């Protein structure tokens, strides 16, 4: 199953300016924030992860009929390699033993985009 999302980076900037740490704490995990602060241009990094979480959420719901919250989806950076997706939700471990969640993130100027793919492990 595939999920796709695109977000205007300005939208994330507006949410950050309006809600501050409350927004960050509700959407992103500690490890995601640490990565974005340390390794990337902060705003596009956040926006790409927002799009990634949306894409994973869409693919996950379509495949399994399980609605995930943003903070239950963790997209961890791997400099030079594809990001790692971790689902932090009780009860899905059994499902994920047989599936792999793959995400690709990108950002360019004003937009960030993500594609998520859930595939059965071989």
UniProtKB/Swiss-Prot annotation:
Primary location: cytoplasm
An annotated GO BP: fatty acid biosynthetic process
EC number: 2.7.8.7
Cellular localisation: Cytoplasm
Gene3D superfamilies, sorted: 4'-phosphopantetheinyl transferase domain (3.90.470.20)
Alphabetical list of InterPro entries matching this protein: 4-PPantetheinyl_Trfase_dom, 4-PPantetheinyl_Trfase_dom_sf, ACPS, Ppantetheine-prot_Trfase_dom
Binding sites annotated in the UniProt record for Mg(2+): 5, 54
GO cellular component: cytoplasm
Pfam family, one: ACPS
Molecular function as annotated in GO: holo-[acyl-carrier-protein] synthase activity; magnesium ion binding
Keyword Lipid biosynthesis in annotation: yes
Annotated function: Transfers the 4'-phosphopantetheine moiety from coenzyme A to a Ser of acyl-carrier-protein.
Family to which this protein belongs: Belongs to the P-Pant transferase superfamily. AcpS family.
Listed name of the protein: Holo-[acyl-carrier-protein] synthase
Native source organism of the sequence: Aquifex aeolicus (strain VF5)
């Amino acid at each position: 199953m595939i999920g796709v999302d695109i977000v205007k980076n300005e939208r994330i900037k507006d949410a950050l300016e309006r809600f501050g740490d409350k927004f960050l704490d509700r959407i992103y995990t500690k490890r995601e924030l640490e990565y974005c602060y340390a390794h990337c241009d902060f705003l596009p990094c956040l926006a790409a992860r927002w799009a990634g979480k949306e894409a994973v959420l869409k693919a996950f719901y379509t495949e399994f009929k399980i609605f995930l919250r943003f903070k239950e989806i963790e997209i961890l950076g791997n400099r030079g390699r594809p990001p790692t997706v971790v689902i932090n939700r009780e009860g899905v471990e059994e499902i994920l033993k047989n599936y792999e969640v793959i995400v690709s993130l990108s950002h360019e100027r004003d937009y960030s985009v993500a594609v998520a793919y859930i595939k059965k492990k071989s």
